[in-house]
């Protein structure tokens, strides 16, 4: 297996399995973490709470990087009708509010939406997708377009919005309980007490990941925490990791296939939406989540509050 050593993997090691020098760096940066935590806490106060008349559910996490928010949002959309996803649209090359999908019709380009939003747009059970830096405007637009439920991707820190907060608890904990840059936490760890439900893998949901072995495939991925795909590394001839949200270039992928005498790219769906027009033969790594009764019933109870 060949691995491309890059900044993304260095960060993964720094936050979750640091060596001696990375631990030293974390302590050197600790004063910056204290400042970061202070301003992060300050930002959660002094804003009027905004209340909506329909269910708003947030799926988020405290730590840096991916913890499975996208598969969990998809799982909620499979369980409940009329779900619209609202997200910031990280790394998109556009500003403001864009309706990416409405009632199963895709209305904008990948450049305008960003990779995560476009991945949602291809999910049949999701009725609409909206990107907006201002989540309140995004929620308002979703309900205007007929959403029954709005699911916010990565909005735990938006405490000015009254919502049902699901906080994903990762199986792999950050090495230090510090905020950025000394640790992986975006908010101090005690903020988890503000969640309505802390979802733990195995107890509240089950994660499925599947792809067939293919010796003629190169695995290429640009997701956070690529080692989540560890069990699949041996299923391809070679593996390459790129920075989260990386914009693939056709020529570089062609060169990787030629280098290893392969004819197929092994990708997550988030990666696939960025290369689908390149004409490559692709094999998708299926990443799914199934809700367990503990989480499903909590969401049902919350939704029923709006039916009274």
From Swiss-Prot:
Species in which this protein is naturally found: Campylobacter jejuni (strain RM1221)
Family classification: Belongs to the LpxK family.
Name of the protein: Tetraacyldisaccharide 4'-kinase
Gene responsible for this protein: lpxK
Keyword Coiled coil appears in the UniProt entry: no
Residues where ATP binds: 63-70
NCBIfam families cross-referenced by the UniProt entry: PRK00652.1-5
Keywords from the named record: ATP-binding, Kinase, Lipid A biosynthesis, Lipid biosynthesis, Lipid metabolism, Nucleotide-binding, Transferase
Pathway(s) it belongs to: Glycolipid biosynthesis; lipid IV(A) biosynthesis; lipid IV(A) from (3R)-3-hydroxytetradecanoyl-[acyl-carrier-protein] and UDP-N-acetyl-alpha-D-glucosamine: step 6/6
Record-level GO cellular component terms: plasma membrane
Biological classification of the source: Bacteria, Pseudomonadati, Campylobacterota, Epsilonproteobacteria, Campylobacterales
Function in brief: Transfers the gamma-phosphate of ATP to the 4'-position of a tetraacyldisaccharide 1-phosphate intermediate (termed DS-1-P) to form tetraacyldisaccharide 1,4'-bis-phosphate (lipid IVA).
InterPro entries: LpxK
Keyword Oxidoreductase: no
Range of residues in the leader sequence: none
Molecular function per GO: ATP binding; tetraacyldisaccharide 4'-kinase activity
A biological process from GO: lipopolysaccharide core region biosynthetic process
EC number: 2.7.1.130
Swiss-Prot/TrEMBL catalytic activity: a lipid A disaccharide + ATP = a lipid IVA + ADP + H(+)
EC top class named in words: transferase
